[in-house]
Swiss-Prot record:
GO cellular component, one term: actin cytoskeleton
Residue numbers carrying Phosphothreonine: 3, 274, 379
Listed name of the protein: Nuclear receptor coactivator 5
Basic and acidic residues composition-biased segments: 11-62, 68-78, 164-173
Organism ancestry: Eukaryota, Metazoa, Chordata, Craniata, Vertebrata
Biased segments, Polar residues type: 395-413, 459-485, 520-537
PANTHER family cross-referenced by the UniProt entry: NUCLEAR RECEPTOR COACTIVATOR 5 (PTHR23295:SF3), NUCLEAR RECEPTOR COACTIVATOR 5-RELATED (PTHR23295)
Location of the protein in the cell: Nucleus
UniProt remark on domains: Contains one Leu-Xaa-Xaa-Leu-Leu (LxxLL) motif that is essential for the association with nuclear receptors.
Organism: Homo sapiens
């Protein structure tokens, strides 16, 4: 039986649809991942999704919305405020506006992007204004807030009102400086013109050539120069006259003799720069030479002179502005402003805050200088102030030694020489009379104290000293009289070495030397004498100045006093006074 060849049955259909075949070329594609086997019904038993959700199963790990188009590898939250296009790592917590490279060696990762030192950072003006107001209200209620700290460290910018006031003050000072500069420039210019030497000196050797010399002088004056005629005497030579003219500062000198008059010529001497002498020049050529060199002289020397005048005027104007700023201008009232550093210390002192010793010394020194400046300005404004400069070292030393030696001359015990209240102000005549009577009483007490028994008891070892003290210069007595009490208190050593000038010995007034040691310091205390005259009083010092400057009578009294003190019986406390 012939049977037909059987055909093989068709192969089982591939369960993958179109495009899902196992193509090795497409399997290795980086774009398409490895194929996944899915059931025919499109649903996996372990997949609880709806069959209509066509998303990739890998997206199930990210609980995002289906419209979230970000990369599946970006695990940032939906609520992240950063831009979707920001490709930096999500662990980077920097500000999104910070585009600085972390690989930069100068990059500071701990520095805030909003730091005010960064030029990229600009704070808004309205926010800054409200912040400053809140900060001010907060700090005003703070009991520990230092309101003087931020005022001078420059951290807070000044307000618009203070800036406008500062600009107005600067403009006012600039106008005042210009005005003062013009005034000082004109004043110095007039002084320079008055002190400027003549431009040309015409030296006339013989008086017979006076008319010719005057004609030459007129031609020189027509060139714009100041001319002076000099007629030589028989005692003065021509070379000496030329030397005097050059020393006086004249740039030109023209010599006229009889030969010059005959030949209508002259000798021109140029003194400035390199000295030149042009002998027997014709008059016309001499005028051309003088005019040319005078222009050069004006260009060189007058320009330097103008610069010097401008420099002095500017310096004087600046000094005047500084003085007005310290004193305070007429629109600022009588009191001027203090320096910022001193003003802060004064404010702290006014608020009863703590100040160190150095800060207190700064305030004291500043106030002392300000007081001296005010007193100096007030004394300069007086019509006829009495100058205390003629009082040299000798008169000042005599004033120092006089009160300290007066209780010793009066023969009183030291405890009775306590300072009394200052006498009421009297007239200058009464003060002068008191001072003169004080000198007279000094001579009387010098004679009477030598006969007192208390001094006679200890006068034996001191007679040689009195003569030696009178022969010593006054500088020695001053230096020894101002010795410290630790040296003067050594009674035994002083007595063995021999008494020194100004150091009272052990037998004086019957008291030991250790008790008299503080008496040597009375030169600096300037006590009131027994006559009631306070030598610290300015009127008393003024009367003393008048007596010292005016008088033979005072010098006569002083000579009498020193003659009485030069005797061997004079006590040790009497000093020589040299005026």
């Amino acid at each position: 039986m012939n049977t037909a060849p059987s055909r093989p049955s068709p192969t089982r259909r591939d369960p993958y649809g179109f495009g899902d075949s196992r193509d090795s070329r497409r399997d290795r594609s980086p774009i398409r991942g490895s194929p996944r086997r899915e059931p025919r019904d499109g649903r996996n038993g372990r997949d609880a999704r709806d069959s209509r959700d066509i998303r990739d199963p890998r997206d199930l790990r990210d609980h995002r919305h289906s419209r979230d188009l970000r990369d599946h590898r970006d695990s940032r939250s939906v609520r992240d405020v950063r831009d979707v296009r920001d490709l930096r790592d999500f662990r980077d917590l920097r500000d999104s506006r910070d585009f600085r490279d972390q690989r930069d060696p100068m990059y500071d990762r701990y520095r805030d992007m909003r730091d005010s030192r960064d030029p990229m950072y600009r704070r808004e003006g309205s926010y800054d204004r409200y912040l400053r107001m809140d900060d001010y209200c907060r700090r005003k209620d703070d009991s520990y807030f230092d309101r003087y700290r931020d005022s001078f460290d420059g951290r807070g910018p000044p307000g618009p009102e203070s800036q406008s006031r500062a600009k107005e003050r600067l403009k006012r000072e600039e106008r005042r400086r210009e005005e003062l500069y013009r005034q000082y420039f004109e004043e110095i210019q007039r002084r320079f013109d008055a002190e400027r030497p003549v431009d040309c000196s015409v030296i006339v050797v013989n008086k017979q050539t006076k008319d010719y010399a005057e004609s030459v002088g007129r031609k020189v004056r027509d060139l714009g120069m100041v001319v002076d005629l000099i007629f030589l005497n028989t005692e003065v030579s021509l070379s000496q006259a030329l030397e005097d003219v050059s020393r006086g500062g004249s740039p030109f000198a023209i010599v006229i003799t009889q030969q010059h008059q005959i030949h209508r010529s002259c000798t021109v001497n140029i003194m400035f720069g390199t000295p030149q002498e042009h002998r027997n020049m014709p008059q016309a050529d001499a005028m051309v030479l003088v005019a040319r060199n005078y222009e050069r002289y004006k260009n060189e020397c007058r320009e330097k002179e103008r610069e010097e005048i401008a420099r002095q005027a500017a310096k004087m104007a600046d000094e005047a502005i500084l003085q007005e700023r310290e004193r305070g201008g007429p629109e600022e009232g009588v009191r001027g402003g203090h320096p910022p550093a001193i003003q802060s210390l004064i404010n702290l002192l006014a608020d009863n805050r703590y100040l160190t010793a150095e800060e207190t010394d700064k305030i004291i020194n500043y106030l002392r200088e300000r007081k001296e400046r005010l007193m100096r300005s007030s004394t300069d404004s007086l019509p006829g102030p009495i100058s205390r400069q003629p009082l040299g070292a000798t008169s000042g030393a005599s004033l120092k030694t006089q009160p300290s030696s007066q209780p010793l001359q009066s023969g009183q015990v030291l405890p009775s020489a306590t300072p009394t209240p200052s006498a009421p102000p009297t007239s200058q005549q009464e003060l002068q009379a008191k001072i003169l009577s004080l000198f007279n009483s000094g001579t009387v007490t010098a004679n009477s104290s030598s006969a007192s028994p208390s001094v006679a008891a200890g006068n034996t070892p001191n007679q040689n000293f009195s003569t030696a003290a009178n022969s010593q210069p006054q500088q020695r007595s001053q230096a020894s009289g101002n010795q410290p009490p630790s040296i003067l208190g050594q009674g035994g050593s002083a007595q063995n070495m021999g008494p020194r000038p100004g150091a009272p010995s052990q037998g004086l007034f019957g008291q030991p030397s250790s008790r008299l040691a503080p008496a040597s310091n009375m030169t600096s205390q300037r006590p009131v004498s027994s006559t009631g005259i306070n030598f610290d009083n300015p009127s008393v010092q003024k009367a003393l100045d008048t007596l010292i400057q005016s008088g033979p009578a005072l010098s006569h009294l002083v000579s009498q006093t020193t003659a009485q003190m030069g005797q061997p019986q004079a006590p040790m406390g009497s000093y020589q006074r040299h005026y």
